[in-house]
Amino acid sequence: MGILSVDLLITLQILPVFFSNCLFLALYDSVILLKHVVLLLSRSKSTRGEWRRMLTSEGMRCIWKSFLLDAYKQVKLGEDAPNSSVVHVSNPEGSNNHGHGTQEKTVDGAECHLLDFANPERPLVVNFGSATUPPFTSQLPAFSKLVEEFSSVADFLLVYIDEAHPSDGWAVPGDSSLSFEVKKHQNQEDRCAAAHQLLERFSLPPQCRVVADRMDNNANVAYGVAFERVCIVQRQKIAYLGGKGPFYYNLQEVRRWLEKNFSKRUKKT
C-alpha cells in the first residue's frame, strides 16, 4: 500500500471521531453559554470575566493534530519503548534519581533520555502532560498517591510536554483553582519554567522524577501524546499503553496493572 493510500486511510479513520469531538465541544459551549445568560439575567456576580468558546478554529486544528499524533505514534504495546530525548527538571520535593536507591543532583535543562530512568528490575510509569491540561492536572493528586503507594516496586517519571491550552492559543476558561495561565513555549527555558510552575502548585513525592520534552517535541510525537497519556515501560518494552487523552486517560487502569503485578510485594514491604 502506497504512502498516499495509508494517509487517506488514516484520514478516513480519524474523521468520525474528529467530528464527534467537535460536536461534544459545540454542546459544551451551548451549555456554558446558556448558564452564562441565566447568570447574567439574574445579575449574578459570577458572570464577571471573559467567556471563552472551546469550539474555535484553533481548537479544531489542535484536535485534528492530536488525532494525527495518535495515528502516527511510534509506540506500540509489547514493542520497544522509544528512548526520547528530554531534559531534567528539578523536583523541589527531592533530587532526581537515576535508578532505584540512588540520587544525583541534576541541573535544569541537562540533556538525558527517557530510558535513562528505567531500571531493568522495575517497571517505569511514565505520565505525560502539561499545566494547561485540566484532565491531567485534576489527576495529579491521584498520580501522587500512586507514587507513594507503589514506589517500593516501581519507578515514576513525569514528562512535561507542549501546552495543551496555552493562554495565547487554544485557551480554556480560567475559572478553576486548577487553571494555569501559560503561554506557548518559545524555548527550553520556557518549558522548564512552566514545569516548575506546575510543581509549585502540585507537590509530587520525591520518588517521582520530572523531565521536560525537547522543543522538537520528540517525546510527544513518539508516544502520540498531544494532551496527556500514561504508559508503563518494563525491560525496555511497553507493558501498558494508556489511551489518548483526555477521554481515555485513565490512572485507574495503571493502578489495576500495578496491583495485579505487584500487590503481594507491596504488602510485604
Swiss-Prot record:
Catalytic residues (positions): U133
Tissues in which the protein is found: More expressed in pituitary than in brain, low to undetectable levels in thyroid and skeletal muscle.
Subcellular localization, as worded in the UniProt entry: Endoplasmic reticulum membrane
Sequence ranges on the Cytoplasmic membrane side: 35-269
Residues exposed to the Lumenal side: 1-9
Keywords: Endoplasmic reticulum, Membrane, Oxidoreductase, Selenocysteine, Thyroid hormones biosynthesis, Transmembrane, Transmembrane helix, Ubl conjugation
GO cellular component terms, A-Z: endoplasmic reticulum membrane
Membrane-related topology note: Single-pass type III membrane protein
Reactions it catalyzes: 3,3',5-triiodo-L-thyronine + iodide + A + H(+) = L-thyroxine + AH2; 3,3'-diiodo-L-thyronine + iodide + A + H(+) = 3,3',5'-triiodo-L-thyronine + AH2; 3'-iodo-L-thyronine + iodide + A + H(+) = 3',5'-diiodo-L-thyronine + AH2; 3,3'-diiodothyronamine + iodide + A + H(+) = 3,3',5'-triiodothyronamine + AH2
Chain segments annotated as transmembrane: 10-34
Functional note: Plays a crucial role in the metabolism of thyroid hormones (TH) and has specific roles in TH activation and inactivation by deiodination.Catalyzes the deiodination of L-thyroxine (T4) to 3,5,3'-triiodothyronine (T3) and 3,3',5'-triiodothyronine (rT3) to 3,3'-diiodothyronine (3,3'-T2) via outer-ring deiodination (ORD). Catalyzes the deiodination of 3',5'-diiodothyronine (3',5'-T2) to 3'-monoiodothyronine (3'-T1) via ORD. Catalyzes the phenolic ring deiodinations of 3,3',5'-triiodothyronamine and 3',5'- diiodothyronamine.
UniProt-recorded name of the protein: Type II iodothyronine deiodinase
Taxonomic path: Eukaryota, Metazoa, Chordata, Craniata, Vertebrata
